[in-house]
Amino acid sequence: MMRTHYCGALNRDNIGQEVTLSGWVHRRRDLGGLIFIDMRDREGIVQVCFDPVYQEALTTAASLRNEFCIQIKGEVIARPDNQINKNMATGEVEVLAKSLSIYNSAEPLPLDFNQNNTEEQRLKYRYLDLRRPEMAQRLKTRAKITSFVRRFMDEHGFLDIETPMLTKATPEGARDYLVPSRVHKGKFYALPQSPQLFKQLLMMSGFDRYYQIVKCFRDEDLRADRQPEFTQIDVETSFLTAPEVREIMEKMVHGLWRETLGVDLGKFPVMTFAEAMRRFGSDKPDLRNPLEMVDVADLLKEVEFKVFNGPANDPNGRIAVIRVPNGTDITRKQIDEYTQFVGIYGAKGLAWLKVNDLAAGMDGVQSPIAKFLSEAVLKALLERVQAQNGDILFFGADNYKVTTDAMGALRLKLGRDLGLTKLEEWQPLWVIDFPMFERDDEGDLAAMHHPFTSPKDFSPEQLEADPTSAVANAYDMVINGYEVGGGSVRIFDPKMQQTVFRILGINEAEQREKFGFLLDALKFGTPPHAGLAFGLDRLTMLLTGTDNIRDVIAFPKTTAAACLMTEAPSFANPQALNELSVQVIKSE
């Protein structure tokens, strides 16, 4: 037998037992005539002692180096009271080694487990990086999450049904990864960006509660929290309303946090998209941050200051204020840095006002813009934002998008910089009632979620007549500023689906070519249905306390969508390309 126990599982209950351990040398120390090693496996570390009583094992131990793969047979003994290590789960015991076998030696490592390595090193030698206890713990947590999800779904009547990986390219927002067909020359499969259409077809097939933990693929520019291939917890239901779907999913996330962290998330507040953008400048607000945006354009229409009266009198303008409590200590240098920061989002400047003494009116404030404000306007402003002595006010004034984006980002930065964001808290919420459509960079209408989302209380005729007023029956779950899941009630009426396609500029011929199977299926008694998908990678990020999605994926890609370990992607064999009728044109 190669193993009877895991290293990290040993404790006082095992004292006196003979054990066989298999794992790696984490560290070695020579103390006089004794040799100690910390031995590691996926469950943790235990101290092993080599004593002259077992001379053969001691002699062999002298050749051990870090990351040798070994087997130990010995007895679990109690550590002396003065040697108990309270920082280790196994710190009350050690193993007295009676025999030692070396499975495999290890060359000097290209990584140093005791120092920070570059991300490039970590990804190139990922198999070594994953040996680090913190990485092993993250992947164990991920496994616990998927185990919990499967149990929860099974208990609530959901069926785990697989959907195809090789499918048809359909417009879902990002670029597809294409797979050429050898049999059907010149034709391509697409790897799915999500199982969206297949799970809707399953609802039409009568499987009223579906789920799947599934790989999805998007060929898009990457960020710290994005990967070209990612994992979704995908869910779809029939005959449930949006609030009922949210209730089930909220219950699942409650259980997940309770089982993983021992944390009670409490009742999730529900907030409309409009309120989230107005108060926080984001559709995924981090409610740990107490700062809010307050609209003041109506108070500044008559001021003789172009920066303010322009947006104040523009129907598409916005002036928003962030009040920072006790912020008068913020220096001019810091204000200049914040001004540069909002410039990233298109803002042309950042006005500010320090409140030194409310009772003194104009004499009690300090600001380059104070000279443009009357006593009445100043008083109304200070009352609107509920200013207190010692506060500083920051003003954003521009078109609606620039002001909202810039001040929303500034709110987050101020929260971090000034220690206002309560990092130890968990603040979940639902965001609902998104716009059905938004304008893309060319000014055309695009679906804010996807083209299969149902509008709220709109007929096809009303939607076609006034699409920009439509609200989507959609919902996102947000935790600490991260969108962890999103979903919607789906369109189940063929006329409504065709109307949405037309609004998006998809003509009838293109509808038949790309979505003919869906439009046909909608004609045969399609039930009302709704669903949601969680990002498993992002959930695991939150539950393990990392801010890099690559830390919770065993073999992730870089921000250039490359695998440094296997050197993927690589050039294909010319013969294989010939069989696929694919020609590679070299870029000049």
From Swiss-Prot:
<dbReference type="InterPro" id="IPR047090">
    <property type="entry name" value="AspRS_core"/>
</dbReference>
<keyword id="KW-0547">Nucleotide-binding</keyword>
<feature type="binding site">
    <location>
        <position position="218"/>
    </location>
    <ligand>
        <name>L-aspartate</name>
    </ligand>
</feature>
<keyword id="KW-0436">Ligase</keyword>
<keyword id="KW-0648">Protein biosynthesis</keyword>
<dbReference type="Pfam" id="PF01336">
    <property type="entry name" value="tRNA_anti-codon"/>
</dbReference>
<keyword id="KW-0963">Cytoplasm</keyword>
<dbReference type="GO" id="GO:0006422">
    <property type="term" value="P:aspartyl-tRNA aminoacylation"/>
</dbReference>
<dbReference type="GO" id="GO:0003676">
    <property type="term" value="F:nucleic acid binding"/>
</dbReference>
<keyword id="KW-0067">ATP-binding</keyword>
<comment type="function">
    <text>Catalyzes the attachment of L-aspartate to tRNA(Asp) in a two-step reaction: L-aspartate is first activated by ATP to form Asp-AMP and then transferred to the acceptor end of tRNA(Asp).</text>
</comment>
<dbReference type="InterPro" id="IPR029351">
    <property type="entry name" value="GAD_dom"/>
</dbReference>
<comment type="similarity">
    <text>Belongs to the class-II aminoacyl-tRNA synthetase family. Type 1 subfamily.</text>
</comment>
<feature type="binding site">
    <location>
        <begin position="218"/>
        <end position="220"/>
    </location>
    <ligand>
        <name>ATP</name>
    </ligand>
</feature>
<dbReference type="InterPro" id="IPR004365">
    <property type="entry name" value="NA-bd_OB_tRNA"/>
</dbReference>
<feature type="binding site">
    <location>
        <position position="490"/>
    </location>
    <ligand>
        <name>L-aspartate</name>
    </ligand>
</feature>
<protein>
    <recommendedName>
        <fullName>Aspartate--tRNA ligase</fullName>
        <ecNumber>6.1.1.12</ecNumber>
    </recommendedName>
</protein>
<dbReference type="InterPro" id="IPR004524">
    <property type="entry name" value="Asp-tRNA-ligase_1"/>
</dbReference>
<dbReference type="GO" id="GO:0005524">
    <property type="term" value="F:ATP binding"/>
</dbReference>
<comment type="subunit">
    <text>Homodimer.</text>
</comment>
<dbReference type="Pfam" id="PF02938">
    <property type="entry name" value="GAD"/>
</dbReference>
<dbReference type="InterPro" id="IPR012340">
    <property type="entry name" value="NA-bd_OB-fold"/>
</dbReference>
<dbReference type="InterPro" id="IPR047089">
    <property type="entry name" value="Asp-tRNA-ligase_1_N"/>
</dbReference>
<feature type="binding site">
    <location>
        <begin position="535"/>
        <end position="538"/>
    </location>
    <ligand>
        <name>ATP</name>
    </ligand>
</feature>
<feature type="region of interest" description="Aspartate">
    <location>
        <begin position="196"/>
        <end position="199"/>
    </location>
</feature>
<dbReference type="InterPro" id="IPR002312">
    <property type="entry name" value="Asp/Asn-tRNA-synth_IIb"/>
</dbReference>
<dbReference type="InterPro" id="IPR045864">
    <property type="entry name" value="aa-tRNA-synth_II/BPL/LPL"/>
</dbReference>
<feature type="binding site">
    <location>
        <position position="227"/>
    </location>
    <ligand>
        <name>ATP</name>
    </ligand>
</feature>
<dbReference type="GO" id="GO:0005737">
    <property type="term" value="C:cytoplasm"/>
</dbReference>
<keyword id="KW-0030">Aminoacyl-tRNA synthetase</keyword>
<dbReference type="Pfam" id="PF00152">
    <property type="entry name" value="tRNA-synt_2"/>
</dbReference>
<dbReference type="GO" id="GO:0004815">
    <property type="term" value="F:aspartate-tRNA ligase activity"/>
</dbReference>
<dbReference type="InterPro" id="IPR004115">
    <property type="entry name" value="GAD-like_sf"/>
</dbReference>
<dbReference type="InterPro" id="IPR004364">
    <property type="entry name" value="Aa-tRNA-synt_II"/>
</dbReference>
<dbReference type="InterPro" id="IPR006195">
    <property type="entry name" value="aa-tRNA-synth_II"/>
</dbReference>
<feature type="binding site">
    <location>
        <position position="172"/>
    </location>
    <ligand>
        <name>L-aspartate</name>
    </ligand>
</feature>
<feature type="binding site">
    <location>
        <position position="449"/>
    </location>
    <ligand>
        <name>L-aspartate</name>
    </ligand>
</feature>
<feature type="binding site">
    <location>
        <position position="483"/>
    </location>
    <ligand>
        <name>ATP</name>
    </ligand>
</feature>
